[in-house]
Curated annotation (Swiss-Prot):
<dbReference type="GO" id="GO:0036503">
    <property type="term" value="P:ERAD pathway"/>
</dbReference>
<dbReference type="InterPro" id="IPR048857">
    <property type="entry name" value="OTU1_Ubl"/>
</dbReference>
<keyword id="KW-0833">Ubl conjugation pathway</keyword>
<feature type="active site">
    <location>
        <position position="352"/>
    </location>
</feature>
<feature type="binding site">
    <location>
        <position position="277"/>
    </location>
    <ligand>
        <name>substrate</name>
    </ligand>
</feature>
<keyword id="KW-0378">Hydrolase</keyword>
<feature type="region of interest" description="His-loop">
    <location>
        <begin position="274"/>
        <end position="278"/>
    </location>
</feature>
<feature type="region of interest" description="UBX-like">
    <location>
        <begin position="8"/>
        <end position="94"/>
    </location>
</feature>
<dbReference type="InterPro" id="IPR029071">
    <property type="entry name" value="Ubiquitin-like_domsf"/>
</dbReference>
<dbReference type="GO" id="GO:0005829">
    <property type="term" value="C:cytosol"/>
</dbReference>
<dbReference type="Pfam" id="PF24560">
    <property type="entry name" value="zf-C2H2_OTU1_C"/>
</dbReference>
<dbReference type="Pfam" id="PF21403">
    <property type="entry name" value="OTU1_UBXL"/>
</dbReference>
<dbReference type="Pfam" id="PF02338">
    <property type="entry name" value="OTU"/>
</dbReference>
<dbReference type="InterPro" id="IPR038765">
    <property type="entry name" value="Papain-like_cys_pep_sf"/>
</dbReference>
<dbReference type="GO" id="GO:0004843">
    <property type="term" value="F:cysteine-type deubiquitinase activity"/>
</dbReference>
<keyword id="KW-0863">Zinc-finger</keyword>
<feature type="region of interest" description="Disordered">
    <location>
        <begin position="83"/>
        <end position="108"/>
    </location>
</feature>
Length: 358
């Protein structure tokens, strides 16, 4: 079977859909289609695929390879750029405003200390150090499972993976990550995490370019630091790398687990549940520990299998929001919009970024 499929192109000139492809389509044919869609000459194409985005080898000796061999599948998003003849961009420091006040300095210091505190928790866990009660907890070597079905056939955990409900605000991603890192449900870590992300993005304008971010690097850095800006894949990836821990996002709409940091071979992982618009952290209650466990060794597959089961059951019972069909109201001009696509297009045309689900 070689059924037809489509891929999505993202470029500075807009987004395009390339249809009627199949696994036997050659890379050379795809290059021609991309060039036609984006009006970029084939020799000037620079294409990135996957996340984090990695360059796709478009050399002539690969042009006869088919898409199956190359690893391009249905629904893939390709970031298309035009090769630049000028020198690569340099890092642009974040704008700090004129005359930083003592209060701003104190806030920056508080953010840094908070980040160091979370990172120190992870270092203690990684080295087998003790963690105070009330802080984050990791299950390292529990006794054999009394009820194997509770953690999966390959697990060593006597516990059940559960969802911790966090406030449904624009910072639910950061609140969830804060909880799995140190066991606290609060907004204190959100501003700090947004600042970390802005710093990382600002420091690498080549990787985090207009095509990847959907806006200029400087605009993104200002946007992500606003309290009403949502986080997603880019932000999860950056925080995974910053904290040195794999963050597994359990996508219940598609019944899959997206493993951020998998390629870094981190030894520990945490789980977040994503329903299409909202994130909640997952934790495990065990008989051995009064403090819920939120961080797990990557090699312990029992917990991972529980997360897969949660995804499958939630999808079956439709416990997710279809972002292509939900209704939003622009809080700036009261216009009604259907789906994420209309909201993004409205934001691009008007600059409005405050939306409320109806």
């Amino acid at each position: 079977m070689t059924g037809s499929f489509s891929v999505k192109l993202k470029s500075k000139k807009g987004q395009f859909i390339v249809k009627d492809l199949n696994q036997n389509t050659t890379l050379g044919e795809l290059k021609t289609r991309i060039a036609q869609a984006t009006a970029i000459q084939e020799l000037q194409l620079h294409v990135l695929v996957g996340y984090p985005p990695k360059p796709l080898d478009l050399s002539e000796n690969r042009e006869n390879q088919n898409l199956k061999t190359v690893g391009i599948n249905s629904g893939e998003t390709l970031i298309v750029e035009e090769k630049a003849g000028a020198a690569g961009p340099t890092s642009t420091p974040l704008a700090s405003g004129s005359g930083s006040s003592t209060m701003e300095d104190d806030e920056a210091l508080a953010r840094r200390l908070q980040a160091e505190e979370d990172a120190e928790h992870l270092r203690q866990v990684s080295s087998g150090g003790s963690i105070e009660t009330g802080a984050l907890n990791i299950v390292q070597s529990l006794e054999p499972v009394i009820s194997p079905e509770e953690s999966g056939p390959n697990g060593n955990f006597n516990g059940i993976l559960l969802k911790k409900v966090v406030p449904a605000d624009n910072s639910c991603l950061f609140t969830s990550i804060r909880f799995v890192l140190n066991g606290k449900v609060d907004n204190e870590g959100s501003e700090m995490m947004r600042h970390i992300i802005a710093q990382e993005v600002s420091a690498d304008t080549q990787q985090y370019n207009d095509a990847v971010l959907g806006k200029s690097n400087s605009d993104y850095c200002a946007w992500i630091q606003k309290a009403d800006s949502w986080g997603g894949a880019i932000e999860v990836s950056i925080l995974s790398n910053y904290y040195g821990i794999e963050i597994d996002v359990v996508d219940i709409q598609n019944a899959i687990i997206n493993r951020f940091g998998e390629d870094k071979n981190f030894g520990l992982r945490v789980f977040l549940l994503f329903d299409g618009i909202h994130y909640d952290p997952l934790y495990m209650e065990t008989q051995q520990n009064s403090v819920p466990a939120t961080i797990f060794p990557v090699e312990e597959m029992g917990v991972y299998q529980q997360a897969e089961q949660i995804a499958n059951e939630a999808k079956s019972s439709r416990q997710f929001t279809n972002v292509d069909k939900f209704t939003l109201r622009c809080m700036d001009c009261d216009v009604m919009l259907v789906g994420q696509g209309q909201a993004q297009e409205h934001a691009k045309k008007t600059g409005h970024e405050n939306f409320e689900e109806i």
